[in-house]
Amino acid sequence: VIWVVMLIIPFVPLGLRAFGLMVWILISGWYAAFLFAVLQSAAAGEQELPSATFSRDLLDDLVYPLFQWIGSWVVVYIPACVYLLLACLGGNVDPFDALRMAFGGIERVFQQGGGQPPAFSILVCIGAFFWPMIILCIALGGFETVYRLDLIVSTIIRTFPVYVLTLLLMFGAAVLERTLTASAAGVSMRFVISVGLTVYFDIVLMRLIGLYYHHFKDRFAWSWG
């Protein structure tokens, strides 16, 4: 069901713009809410995946989860974006190139790392390194927990081998997803496979992050129960 729903998103803007944007927000929010539920259920030690349902509170069940998901990436990429802003003001980077780099994120760094400012690439990689912990904090404790960098860094140090393993699995899944998608014949088939793999690996990643907390929460600098 999730796979089919996610296939709809790229075609939504082809209709009325305002209506299309609203539908995109609802579908993306629903998907983000499901991913957060997967992480939270794994963190609680539950074996089964949560159901992809929501109540009729659109703001709390759809809009806010999407805001949290986007916000998690904004938080980790703030240093890189500040660097781009300063580079643009200094005339070292074209504003349009800066926008492309900012929206490209970690994928663009790996694809065109040599064509981007080294400082920007380093800051993006540092942000991606912290993302699993940031999304975990937001999912379990809200945005107010991401400001405690001392606790975040302390927790990563205490669980460093497992945290690095989680990161390697995250990037490995991304590489595998891209490889399998590229091997498919035909643009339409690649699109369908890409969406399916994205959904699958997103679920796996959220489970991994949740289980990371469940099994090693005694080493965390704080606790959510």
Q: What are the language-model segments listed below?
A:
Residues 6-10, 75, 128-129:
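Hydrophobic alpha-helical transmembrane segments of integral membrane proteins
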Residues 1-9, 36-57, 220-225:
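N-terminal juxtamembrane cytosolic/stromal segments of multi-pass membrane proteins
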Residues 1-14, 169-173:
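Hydrophobic alpha-helical transmembrane segments of multi-pass membrane transport/permease proteins
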Residues 66-78:
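Selective transmembrane-helix segments that form parts of the transport pathway or gating/packing helices
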Residues 13-47, 81-150, 162-167, 171, ...:
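Selective recognition of hydrophobic, aromatic-rich stretches within alpha-helical transmembrane segments
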Residues 50-67, 148-160:
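Membrane-interface segments at loop-to-transmembrane junctions
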